[in-house]
Regions:
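Short, low-complexity, intrinsically disordered N-terminal peptides in bacterial proteins
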Residues: 1-18
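A conserved beta-strand-loop-helix scaffold within acyl/acetyltransferase catalytic domains
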Residues: 17-65, 69-81, 132, 154-168, ...
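Acyl-donor binding region in acyl/amide transferases
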Residues: 81-164
Length: 268
């Protein structure tokens, strides 16, 4: 979505809410409580963006008690034609809520104007359409949300397929509510998947967390995968900055086979 102009009608609708800059703590609390929250809308992500030379701001929408009810982390970077603002998997607001979206859009516009940004682009972390494993739609798409953004001056950039250059638009989610144990969960997968899990168990595969000095291993594995799956890998420096920004909240995992342990267990 790209943001353009607002109208007098929108300004009147936003009068019930106030916009102010949130502290890092306020924003993290908002993100944690919001159904639209995620790691890309956190203070840690702001630290990561700042390490790349970007300016960041926590734009918050507060109620009459000054309590945050919606907001967005905006990262401003120098583009080819001027400063550009990005809301990664944001804003933290229901796109179908006309009043809150109107007020928040006004606040985002003002934040962009203060840094002379030429555009704002957002990737809302809100479901547009739920599909089954075969790709069949299970409900009507949320076109009302798209129309609401457009009413506020945002322009829809269209849908994409496959790996996106900036943001993943497709998410596969496994509903675990119907399973009471690991055995039932495993049984729900296809035969080939169950066989691969069994092979991994019998082969002594171990999963562990890498420390910072081992991130080159993670990078090299991603590089091999990117060549096979045709997506762009990140640099080792990027992974190190993610590690530094998120601390214990970021886990870089690796699966290993320790042949000596495997052979010893097989002999026993």
């Amino acid at each position: 979505m790209r943001e353009v102009n607002a109208s007098e009608e929108q300004e009147q609708e936003s009068s019930e809410w106030n916009v102010r800059e949130l502290s890092a703590g306020e924003f993290d609390a908002l993100s944690a409580a919001s159904e639209y929250g995620g790691f890309q809308q956190t203070s840690e992500m702001a630290v990561l963006a700042q390490s790349e030379g970007m300016q960041t701001q926590y734009v918050g929408l507060v109620d009459s008690h000054d309590a945050p009810v919606a907001g967005a982390l905006v990262a401003f970077s120098q583009g080819r034609f001027g400063v550009e603002g990005s809301l990664w998997l944001g804003p933290l607001c229901n796109g179908n809520n006309r009043e809150q979206m109107t007020a928040l859009t006004e606040g985002l516009r003002e934040a962009a104007e203060r840094v002379h940004a030429i555009s704002l682009t957002c990737w809302p972390n809100q479901v547009y359409c739920v599909r089954d494993s075969q790709g069949k739609a299970m409900a009507e798409p949320n076109d009302e949300m798209v129309r609401e953004y457009e009413r506020l001056g945002w322009k829809h950039a269209g849908f994409t397929r496959g790996y996106d250059a900036l943001m993943n638009r497709w998410n596969y989610v496994k509903d675990l509510r119907e399973f009471s144990n690991a055995g039932e969960l495993l049984a729900s997968y296809a035969k080939n998947t169950r066989r691969n899990v069994k092979i991994a168990r019998n082969s002594g595969v171990e999963v562990r967390r890498l420390n910072r000095s081992e991130l080159n291993v993670f990078h090299d594995i991603c590089e091999l995968s990117s060549e096979r799956q045709h997506f762009a890998n990140r640099s080792l420096d990027y992974f190190e900055r993610v590690y530094d920004a998120f601390g214990d909240k970021a886990e870089f995992m690796v699966a290993e086979v320790h042949l000596d342990r495997y052979l010893q267990s097989s002999l026993n």
